[in-house]
C-alpha cells in the first residue's frame, strides 16, 4: 500500500462552503485547508445518500471570514459517510484543488501563512 504525503501544511478553519456537483449544490463546512487541498463535510437530507466518487470533478466556493470568497475547481480525492441519522447523512470529502485563480491562490496562501504563525 502506498501512503501519499501532503505537500503543503493544512490549517484548521471553519468556513461555510458550497459544493456544486453533477447532482446539484450542497452547503457544508470546510474544516481544514492547504494551498492544494481541503477537507469538508456536509449533511445530505437523504439518509440513504452515497458519498461522491473519487476523481469526480466539482466546483467549490469557500466563504472566508471578512467577506471574501475563494472559488475553485477540484477533484474528489476521497469521500466517506461519517454518520447516518434518521433524517440525514453526514458526508466527508477530501478535495484536491485543481484550478484556483492566481488572486485567490495568493489570498489563500496569505491566509494559511497567517494562521500558521
What name fits each language-model region?
Residues 13, 26, 58, 70-72, ...:
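Hydrophobic core residues within well-ordered beta-strands of beta-rich domains
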Residues 22-24, 35-36, 79-85, 102:
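Short, conserved beta-turn/loop elements at beta-strand boundaries and strand-helix junctions
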Residues 1-46, 109-117:
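N-terminal helix initiation/capping motif
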Residues 27-30, 72-79:
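Short beta-strand-centered aromatic/proline hotspots
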Residues 46-48, 82-83:
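Short beta-strands and strand-coil junctions in structured, solvent-facing domains, enriched
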Residues 15-20, 51-69:
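Short conserved beta-strand and strand-loop elements enriched in small hydrophobics
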Residues 13, 84-117:
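C-terminal output/interaction extensions
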